[in-house]
Design a protein with these regions (language model features):
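A residue-level detector for the "anchor" residue at the start of short, highly conserved motifs
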Residues: 1-68
Length: 68
């Protein structure tokens, strides 16, 4: 991923992990992400890597991830 809008990153993660990601914080609007995910990485480990550059908290409720 190179300069990919955060919303597109979330959409890709939704498809990869069969979850719904709800963005509750406007700070994500306009954010871009450059990085690489490896096959076999867990959703939680990917979210932790993203949190390094864009601090946020998240909750998991069954198949829904809420980003705050």
């Amino acid at each position: 991923l190179h300069q990919t809008p955060f919303t597109q990153v979330c959409h890709r993660l939704e498809q990869m992990f069969n979850v719904k990601i709800v963005i509750m914080n406007d700070k994500f609007i306009g954010k871009k992400f450059t990085g690489e995910f490896r096959f076999g990485d867990s959703l939680e480990s990917i979210l932790e890597v993203i949190r390094i550059t864009t601090p946020f908290t998240y909750e998991r409720e069954e198949d829904t991830i809420i980003l705050k």
